[in-house]
C-alpha cells in the first residue's frame, strides 16, 4: 500500500523547502529593465484610459477573495503520488511566475515613484495582486509539506534584462495567456467537478480577472507608446513574442501532459484553445498576429517536442559531455529551423483579422 501522505519525491534545499526548478528555456524567468526610460515615459497619448484602469486597480475587487476555506484541510492526502508530483510542479511554476511579476512591478513602482506617479501606482497595485497570488500558491504547496523560499529565489535567480518595449510585449502576453489558461480550466471543472483534484481551482474565475486587468493595463500602456505597436519593426517584434510565448507554453505543457490528464484535459487540445483565444485577444493591440491555423503550425511544434525528447534521452546517457554535445547538435539545429520557419509564415493583419474589435 502507498502512503497517501508521502511527500512527492522532489529535491529540497532543506526540510520542507523545495529547491528551485533547474533553469531551462521553458522555466519562468525574472526580469529587469531600463528604469530611467520608464520614469521618462510620456503617457499623454492614452492617459485617460490608464487613469481609468488605475481606478479599477484601486477598487481591488479581489481583496477578500484569496482566503483559504476548510475545504483545503487534508485535500492533498487524496492524491496519488504521481499526481502529487506533477501538481506540485504546477504550483511551483505558477508561484515562480507570479513572484517574478511581483518583483518586477514592485521595483518599477519604487524606482519611478517620484517622476512618473501614475505609472508607479499602477505597478504598485499590480505588485499587490501578484504577491497575493504567489502567497496563495506557496501556501498551497505547504499542504504537500513543501514551500518555495521566495527570499532565496530573489537573491539567487538570474535576471534577464529586457528594454521596456520587450517588457510590454512579454508581460502583456503573459497576463492575457494567464487569463485564458485559468478561465478555461475553471469552466472545464465547472462542467466536470469530478476532476477538481484540489480546491484552488475554485478560485480561478476571480483570479483570472486580475490577469485580465493587468493585460488591459499593458494594452493601454502600449497605446500610449505608439512606436511599440506601429510600423514594420513593431510588427516583427510582435510576431517574435507571440511565437516565443506560444511555442514555450505548448512544448512545456505537452511535456507535462500528466497534470492536464489529472484534470480530465488533453494538453494539446487545451493549449490549442488557449493559443487561439490569446492570439485573437492580441489582435486588439498588436498590429499583426500569428496564423495559428496554418497547417504546419502545430506540426512544427510537434517536431520540436520530438527533438526535445531525443535531447533528454541523450542527456540521460553516460556518454562524455563533448559526445553529448555533438549528438544533441542536430536536434538543436532542427528546433531552430522549425521556429524560424514558423516565424516566416505570413502573419495576419489585425485590422483584417478582427475588424469589429479594432
Swiss-Prot record:
Catalytic reaction list: Mg-protoporphyrin IX 13-monomethyl ester + 3 NADPH + 3 O2 + 2 H(+) = 3,8-divinyl protochlorophyllide a + 3 NADP(+) + 5 H2O
Tagged with keyword Oxidoreductase: yes
SUPFAM superfamilies associated with the record: Ferritin-like
EC number assigned by the record: 1.14.13.81
Required co-factors: Fe cation
Domain of life from the UniProt record: Bacteria
Pathway: Porphyrin-containing compound metabolism; chlorophyll biosynthesis (light-independent)
Matches recorded under InterPro entries: AcsF, Ferritin-like_SF, Rr_diiron-bd_dom
UniProt xrefs under Pfam families: Rubrerythrin
GO molecular function, one term: magnesium-protoporphyrin IX monomethyl ester (oxidative) cyclase activity
Keywords attached to this entry: Chlorophyll biosynthesis, Iron, Metal-binding, NADP, Oxidoreductase, Photosynthesis
Catalytic EC class: oxidoreductase
GO BP, sorted A to Z: light-independent chlorophyll biosynthetic process; photosynthesis
Coiled-coil region(s): none
Record NCBIfam families: AcsF, PRK13654.1
Role noted for this protein: Catalyzes the formation of the isocyclic ring in chlorophyll biosynthesis. Mediates the cyclase reaction, which results in the formation of divinylprotochlorophyllide (Pchlide) characteristic of all chlorophylls from magnesium-protoporphyrin IX 13-monomethyl ester (MgPMME).
Family: Belongs to the AcsF family.
PANTHER family: MAGNESIUM-PROTOPORPHYRIN IX MONOMETHYL ESTER [OXIDATIVE] CYCLASE, CHLOROPLASTIC
Entry protein name: Magnesium-protoporphyrin IX monomethyl ester [oxidative] cyclase
Origin species: Synechococcus elongatus (strain ATCC 33912 / PCC 7942 / FACHB-805)
Organism lineage: Bacteria, Bacillati, Cyanobacteriota, Cyanophyceae, Synechococcales
